[in-house]
Structure formats: C-alpha cells, structure tokens
Regions:
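Generic N-terminal amphipathic, Lys/Arg-enriched alpha-helix
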Residues: 1-16
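Active-site-proximal beta-alpha core segment in soluble small-molecule metabolic enzymes
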Residues: 42-179
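Active-site loop/helix belt of alpha/beta enzymes
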Residues: 137-253
C-alpha cells in the first residue's frame, strides 16, 4: 500500500489506533490470566482475523462469534475452537455440522428443550455437536432465568445422554451491566452474573451431569468483577476498542478508545451553529447508549474539538449534523477538512465498514496509515 495519511483516505472511513488496541488487549489478557480464567474473546466487535489473532496471543485460541458467517471466516483464518454465541435453531444445524466436519470445534448454544431434541436427533443421524446451555443472569434477553432455571435438567439430560453430543457447559451474558456507572454497581452485577452461572453449573453437577465450562462475560463485568470463583471462562468483546459508552460507565479511560470514524466537513450553517459532515446514520449508527450517562454526546463526539461539547447531534442517512456548546470556529474547520468521531457503540458503528484503516498514535500521533485489517460482515 502506498504511503497514506488520514487526508488521503475516502470518507467516511473507519480508523483504528493500533497502539491503543494493543494496550486494551494486553490489559484484559493480563487481568484474566492473573485471575486464572480462560479468555474467549467475543469477536463480534472486531470481526477481523488480524485482531482476533492479537486478542488470543498468549492464550489457547478459543473465541466467540455471533454469526455463522463469522464462524466460517474465523475457521478459514485458522481458529478451531469457536463458540457461536446466539441461540441455535434446527435449520442452522447443518451449517454447524459442516464446519465441525472440517475439524472446527464449533460450539452452539440453546435454552430450549425442543432445540436440544433436534440437536440429539441430528447427532443420531451421524453428526456431532458441542453445546452450551444459556443462563439468564439478569439481563432479560436469552437464557433460562436464574434462580428457577426452568427446564435446565431436562435440556441437560437430553444433551448429555445423546450419542455424539458434548454438553460443553453453561454460559451467560450480563448485558444489564451496561446500565451501571459506578464501580460498586458494576461489581454487584458481576457478582450476580457469577452467582447465577456458578449456581447453574452446581445444579447440573449435583444431578450427576458434568459441566466442564462455566462461561460468563461482558466487558464491564470482566473489568469490574471482584470474584471469579467458579468461573473458568470469560467472553468480553468491546474491550478491544472501547467506546463512549464504556468510558462513561467506567470500564475504560478516555485514552482507551481505539476506534473512530473519519469524515469530511461538507457544509457550514452558522445561523444554527452547526456544520454537516458526510458521516450519517449508516456511517455512525443511531445507537444512543452513551446518552444515558451524558446526553450531549449525541451520536458521537468530535476528536480534538476546538470548542466544548462538539458532537454529532443528529443524523440522516448520509448526513451528520455537528453542533457544539459554544460558537463553532468555522475558520478552523473549512469545507473539505477532516474530523474524527468517537462512537457511542463501537460494535454497531464498525458494522458498516469492510475494513479498518490502521494508524498508530505511538509512531506519528496517528496521522499516517500503517495498514488495513479486513472485516467480515453479514450473516
């Protein structure tokens, strides 16, 4: 690739600071290694083989994905222990089986008796499966709700007794951690998550059913947990990049945000103290998660803004409306100049792009493009 700077790139473009990425990866890697907990990073955020390889460096290589397209992509990239972390349906079992026949230990997830029976039936036809039972530790999304765990033993027995099926363990995701913003509050959610998933594992073991893997994880609970006892695997994801939401809930510092969107200024509107950029809803997403804690961030904040509270305050499909808490100095930001926007939710913002343009703030302040990483999108 010919030498490029940020000024040479088409806009909008997805910019990744490699130096910050590496620091984020090392911080989580060291934390879980010191705790004696296996790291299975959730690569739905990065969706990149290059970043995935960096994330598992020094660990055993296990990963989590959220689509079958990701599973195929990472399998082609050499990953062999992959958890497909979205509840499986019978129509997708042939795709799982196909990857497993290639030697990939693609594991699936269920919280449903009928699906467990379908998995057992597919195994009787000659395929093999590795399955986690999903537990709801308080997020209210998927999983058997703790503490009642209705159907846990029925599902577990179907899977455990089926030839060709491995009951890999139990897993949970404390998604409600994203609504806390104090260390004590986040630690409390992490402990709730731990008690639920360890309790589910103990219930299986008391019934004589093995439960090898006890898997939990979100970035906030991985960062703020004060007790990993009984958990032997964590699945954080957004920690690789971080974002405004993670900053505001206290999972990272402002200097830990590795991802931004590069956009061009396309119009000045001083009568309303706004300017337009060519990054709108499709380039940034309309995720407003960070507004729960700091409403003025809008749909993303401007990096190195010349005035206070400069942010994307509204979006249409391809237009971003930039406002500020003070008069915008338009002379500093002429039409055609570039700005970078920090996203509210890195996972959703990154999903619009097919590649990362990689910079390194430790080399030249992050002005030069030092490479690209590809991404997998779709399902």
């Amino acid at each position: 690739m010919a030498a490029q700077t940020l000024d040479d790139l088409p806009t909008p473009a997805l910019i990744l600071d490699r130096a910050i990425l590496r620091r984020n990866l090392k911080r989580m890697s060291d934390r879980l290694r010191d705790a004696g907990v296996a790291l299975r990073p959730h690569l739905k955020t990065a969706k990149s083989v290059e970043i995935g390889r960096m994330a598992v460096e020094g660990h055993d290589g296990r990963i989590t994905v959220s689509t079958l397209a990701e599973a195929r992509y990472f399998a082609d990239g050499g990953f062999s222990d992959i958890l497909y972390g979205v509840g499986i349906v019978p129509s997708k079992l042939p795709a799982v089986a196909e990857l497993r026949r290639r030697g990939v230990n693609l594991r699936c997830v269920t919280d449903n008796v009928a699906v467990a029976r379908a998995i057992a039936g597919a195994a009787r036809a000659g395929d093999t499966f590795s399955v986690f039972i999903e537990i709801d530790s308080g997020a209210g999304r998927a999983g058997l709700p703790w503490p009642d765990l209705p159907g846990l033993l029925d599902i577990a027995r179907i899977l455990h007794e089926a030839p060709g099926v491995e009951l890999a363990g139990v897993m949970t995701h404390a998604g409600h951690s994203y609504h806390e913003s104090t260390p004590d509050g986040l630690a409390a959610v992490a402990e709730q998550e731990r008690r639920a998933i360890v309790g589910a594992a103990e219930r299986l073991r008391q019934a004589g059913i093995p439960c090898p893997i006890v898997s939990a994880g979100s970035t906030p609970t991985a960062v703020h947990s004060r007790n990993f006892a009984g958990i032997n695997e964590m699945r954080p994801g957004v920690y690789v990049f971080n974002d405004l939401d993670q900053e505001f809930i206290g999972s990272c510092a402002p200097t830990d945000l590795a991802l931004s969107v590069l956009a061009s200024v396309i119009g000045h509107y001083p009568h309303r103290n706004q300017m337009l950029i060519d990054a709108g809803a499709l380039a940034l997403s309309k995720d407003i998660s960070a507004q729960e804690f700091k409403p003025q961030v809008g749909f993303g904040t401007i990096v190195d803004a010349p005035v206070r509270d400069m942010a994307v305050v509204a979006c249409s499909q391809e237009h971003g409306f930039v406002g500020a808490g003070e008069p915008i100095p338009y002379g500093n930001l002429p039409v055609g100049s570039r700005v970078r926007i920090l996203p509210n939710h890195a996972c959703i913002t990154a999903a619009a792009y097919d590649r990362y343009y990689v910079v390194d703030s430790e080399l030249d302040g992050g002005r030069s493009v030092v490479g690209t990483y590809d991404r997998i999108n779709g399902w």
